[in-house]
C-alpha cells in the first residue's frame, strides 16, 4: 500500500513533465496517461463510472460537450468514458491546485478567468479555433457547481455556447 501511494505521488511530477513536452508526447499519449491516473483515483475512491450513448458521438471532426456540473469528479468522469482525446475549459481560480493543474495541463485545458471579460473572449476564440481543427472540449455552461444545488441544473452563463456556434460544430449534451 505504501509503495502504491509513493508511485501515485511520483505521477504528479511525471504528469507535469509530459505536459511540458508536447513535442515528445502526443496528445493521445498524454490523454491516455490522464485516463490512467483517473483509473487509479477511481480504484482508491471506490468510484464506478458508466457512460451511455457513445455511439451517438460524431465520428469525425471537433465538437463541444456541454454538461451539467455536480462536483469535482465531473470532467474526470467524462474523460474516463470518452475514448478520443478531449480537453476542458475550467475556472482559472480552481485550476492551479495540486493534481488539478497536472490534469488540466496534460489535456491542454483552457483556464477561464471569470471576472475578466477580455481574457474570456480570448479563450472562446481559442476554443473555437481548436474545435474547427478537430479538437473536442468539455464545457460546463453553468460555470461551476455549488455543493448546495441538490442535483439541480444551475442557470447557464451567457456566452457558454459561443465557441460551438462560431465553430459551427456539433453540440453534444452530457447529463451527469
Briefly describe each language-model feature range:
Residues 1-63, 77:
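Membrane-anchoring hydrophobic helices of lipid-metabolizing enzymes
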Residues 48-176:
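Soluble catalytic domains of membrane acyltransferases
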Amino acid at each position: 500500500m505504501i509503495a502504491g501511494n509513493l508511485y501515485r505521488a511520483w505521477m504528479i511530477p511525471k504528469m507535469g513533465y509530459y505536459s511540458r513536452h508536447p513535442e515528445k508526447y502526443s496528445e493521445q499519449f498524454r490523454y491516455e496517461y490522464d485516463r490512467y491516473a483517473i483509473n487509479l483515483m477511481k480504484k482508491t475512491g471506490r468510484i464506478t463510472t458508466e457512460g451511455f450513448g457513445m455511439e451517438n458521438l460524431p465520428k469525425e471532426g471537433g465538437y463541444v460537450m456541454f454538461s451539467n456540473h455536480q462536483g469535482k469528479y465531473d470532467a474526470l468522469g467524462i474523460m474516463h468514458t470518452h475514448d478520443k482525446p478531449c480537453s476542458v475549459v475550467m475556472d482559472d481560480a480552481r485550476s492551479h491546485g495540486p493534481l488539478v493543474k497536472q490534469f488540466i495541463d496534460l489535456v491542454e485545458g483552457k483556464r477561464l478567468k471569470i471576472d475578466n471579460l477580455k481574457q474570456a473572449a480570448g479563450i472562446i476564440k481559442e476554443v473555437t479555433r481548436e474545435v474547427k481543427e478537430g479538437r473536442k472540449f468539455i464545457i460546463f455552461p453553468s460555470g461551476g457547481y455549488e455543493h448546495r444545488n441538490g442535483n439541480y441544473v444551475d442557470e447557464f452563463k451567457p456566452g457558454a455556447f459561443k465557441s460551438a456556434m462560431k465553430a459551427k460544430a456539433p453540440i453534444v449534451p452530457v447529463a451527469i
